[in-house]
Structures are given as structure tokens and as C-alpha cells.
């Protein structure tokens, strides 16, 4: 008997494992909400042909500016600090679900890094190496260049869409 937050975290784990990872010719950044139903504002996970959750969150403005300045590792450290101090069950469950969402984002990032490494083995274009080097630390650490900032913002935005949160960029 899982809570809705636990079900969502499990769904997000499934999404990041099942979604196709695309590295398209000519593109200079990566990240795509590529799981078929992610084009709709729904959590793209079905059970016996039906959506598990229905509609996702829409028309939200996320704190991309702060995520860019601090990097997502800083958020995780804050969550850990709250978890070690908080004794409220509801807040603890929310924060654990936040950590699970970050873990899913890390796995999705890892899949992109692996795909880039594989593609570079057969097609060692400088463009692909630059994308790989650019993606290596973002969105977890603050970007050091404008190019990293673009990649960090886009990757975070695409992950939000993939997880059924349709944000505006600003």
C-alpha cells in the first residue's frame, strides 16, 4: 500500500528507464521529453492501459533561476538538512519524494552520458565530445559557462516535462 508520493516516485523511476534517449544530428544540447505520452500534460505511465495518475501539474513556474545559480546538488544538501532535523511525517514524506525525484533525474542524466559515450565510440565528432563535456556536471553543479547554463536549463526543463510538470521557463 503505497502513498501517492511513493507511487509517483516509482512511476518516475520507470519513466526515466523507459524513455528513449535521443542525441540528434546537429543539436548542441541534449534532453528530450521523449516518452510518447509526455507530449501530453499527463504522467506518462499506464497500468492495464490506463493512466496511473491522470493529468500532471500544468502552468507552473519552477525556480530554474535558483537551480542555475546553486546547482541541484545544493537542493539535495538542503533536503538532507531538513530530513535530519524534521520530525513531521508529512514533510518528511515530501522531502523523501524530492530526493527520489533527484535520484531519477540523476539516472536520466547517466543514461544521456552513457549514450553520448557510446555514440562517441563510433562517431568521435568534436560536437559530441563538447556536448558530453558540457553535460558532465550540470544541472547538479552551477554552470561555469553560458553553454553549460543553456544545457542545465534545457535538461531541467525537459525532465520537468517528462515527469508531467509543464512549466514555463520564466
What are these regions (language model features)?
Residues 1-170:
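Catalytic cofactor-binding cores of redox enzymes
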Amino acid at each position: 500500500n503505497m502513498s501517492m508520493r511513493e507511487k509517483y516516485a516509482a512511476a518516475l523511476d520507470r519513466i526515466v528507464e523507459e524513455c528513449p534517449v535521443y542525441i540528434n544530428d546537429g543539436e548542441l544540447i541534449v534532453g528530450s521529453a521523449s516518452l510518447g505520452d509526455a507530449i501530453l500534460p499527463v504522467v506518462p505511465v499506464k497500468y492495464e492501459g490506463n493512466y496511473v495518475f491522470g493529468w500532471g501539474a500544468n502552468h507552473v513556474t519552477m525556480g530554474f533561476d535558483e537551480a542555475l545559480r546553486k546547482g541541484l546538488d545544493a537542493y539535495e544538501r538542503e533536503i538532507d538538512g531538513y530530513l535530519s532535523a524534521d520530525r513531521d511525517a508529512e514533510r518528511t514524506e515530501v522531502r523523501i519524494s524530492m530526493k527520489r525525484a533527484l535520484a531519477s533525474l540523476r539516472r536520466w542524466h547517466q543514461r544521456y552520458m552513457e549514450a553520448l559515450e557510446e555514440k562517441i565510440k563510433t562517431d568521435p565528432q568534436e560536437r559530441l565530445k563538447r556536448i558530453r563535456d558540457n553535460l558532465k556536471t550540470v544541472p547538479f553543479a552551477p554552470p561555469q559557462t553560458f553553454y553549460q547554463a543553456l544545457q542545465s536549463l534545457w535538461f531541467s526543463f525537459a525532465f520537468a516535462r517528462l515527469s508531467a510538470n509543464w512549466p514555463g521557463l520564466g
